[in-house]
Regions:
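Membrane-proximal helix-turn-helix segments that form the acceptor-binding/catalytic region
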Residues: 140-158
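A charged, aromatic-enriched C-terminal amphipathic alpha-helix characteristic of glycosyltransferases
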Residues: 343-379
Length: 383
């Protein structure tokens, strides 16, 4: 069985780092019958300093069949350790998640090259999108300039999830040695339609995302200011407050609402709990500035719930598919759509839910995607 050595800043049981953790967890869940995974990660949750209590640090932990995880402490991360792990595992592939981490992106590339690993993959995980680079842009642009100057990414294979991400990589990195395009895996799950009552002119909306500029939380809240007073909206926010100043701006908007709009900040929840929570709402409301994949969008479909999202994600033409809306970032467009959904009768709303579930079924039962990954890790052919 071929061995894949993975480097990622945060991994399960952590969940607060969002999409990259979910992407890697789903990949392992779908492929661990075909490959042995060795995952190197931090022994702490995102933005926390206390180590996990249910893992053993600085040694391999049995995580799942054919999956081992090495949770390393802050004082242990080094080029020397990474080289030692590479020598002990003898991987066929080194697979690196992310771009801007010195310890879990740059050092692993250096270690793998020094140990003459034949195949090194980098998955940017959306970090080279314009919306992502725009956050703390000066630091990121300097970082990328240094990687180009030092030719860090020479002779690296890239894993992008779609053509748009491929264009982002070429625009920021330059000429690439090799690229594979393979979409993210969904969470493994049994899908079913659990209906929800749809009272006239009343909506329960939810968002599962960091409270941060790139997720456009402030825009979402400002959009609600334009919703008609005839519509009653309850909007629950799940996610980490990433920036206190940004959250204060959000609270300033919330303070302006009339009685028909109610916003609740719920806080951070484990991503494993998301599917069971979404079906208590009528729709996901997430007008983010950009998503490389948007796991929570797919999970809304898996819960048979439509979405109201921006047109800056891979999930497009949703109104045509009668499964939701993907809109340009214009506040009044979102407000009118919320009013439209609120006025929708039960039978029409149920059609939206069923169509959302159909999108999920197509994504979950995608044998071609599994074949694409198998070929990606086994073959040298570039496509």
């Amino acid at each position: 069985m071929r061995k894949i050595l993975v480097f990622i800043d945060w991994f399960l049981p952590g969940y607060k780092a969002g999409g990259p953790v979910r992407s890697m967890a789903n990949m392992v869940e779908h492929l661990n019958n075909d490959f042995s995974f060795y995952i190197v990660t931090r022994n702490t949750e995102y933005l926390e300093t206390e180590p996990y209590t249910d893992v053993i640090s600085n040694q391999w932990n049995d995580f799942a069949p054919n999956v081992k995880v090495f949770y390393t402490g802050n004082n242990k991360k080094s080029l020397r350790l990474w080289r030692k792990l590479i020598r002990s595992v003898k991987p066929d592939v080194v697979y690196i998640n992310g771009i801007y981490s010195p310890y879990f992106s740059i050092l692993p590339i250096r270690a793998a090259k020094l140990e003459k690993v034949d195949r090194i993959y980098v998955a940017p995980r959306g970090m080279l999108a314009a919306s992502a680079i725009g956050v703390k842009s000066f630091r990121k642009k300097i970082f990328l300039a240094i990687t180009r100057l030092l030719r860090i990414y020479d002779n690296i294979e890239w894993h992008t999830t779609n053509e748009k991400e491929l264009r982002n990589v070429i625009e920021t990195i330059g000429e690439l040695s090799s690229v594979r395009i393979a979409d993210n895996f969904p969470r493994k799950a049994e899908l079913s339609f659990i209906p929800i009552d749809k009272a006239p002119m009343k909506l329960r909306l939810c968002s599962f995302a960091r409270i941060a500029p790139e997720k456009n939380t402030l825009f979402a809240l400002q959009s609600l200011l334009s919703v008609s007073g005839k519509v009653s909206v309850e909007f629950d926010l799940y996610g980490q407050i990433y920036d206190a100043d940004y959250w204060q701006k959000c609270k300033n908007v919330i303070a302006q609402y009339s009685e028909n709009i109610k916003v609740n900040y719920i806080g951070v929840i484990n991503s494993d709990d998301v599917p069971g929570i979404i079906n208590a709402y009528h729709a996901l409301f997430l007008p983010s500035r950009g998503e490389n994949f948007g796991h929570v969008i797919l999970e809304s479909f898996m819960a048979a719930r439509p979405v109201i999202i921006s047109d800056q994600t891979p999930w497009r033409n949703l109104e045509e598919k009668q499964a939701g809306w993907d809109l340009p970032l214009v506040e009044t467009r979102f407000a009118k759509t919320i009013e439209q959904l609120a006025a929708m009768p039960q039978n029409e709303f149920d059609v939206l839910c069923q169509n959302a579930l159909s999108i999920a079924n197509e994504a979950v039962n995608n044998e071609r995607l599994i074949s694409t990954y198998k070929n990606m890790f086994k073959s040298w052919e570039v496509y």
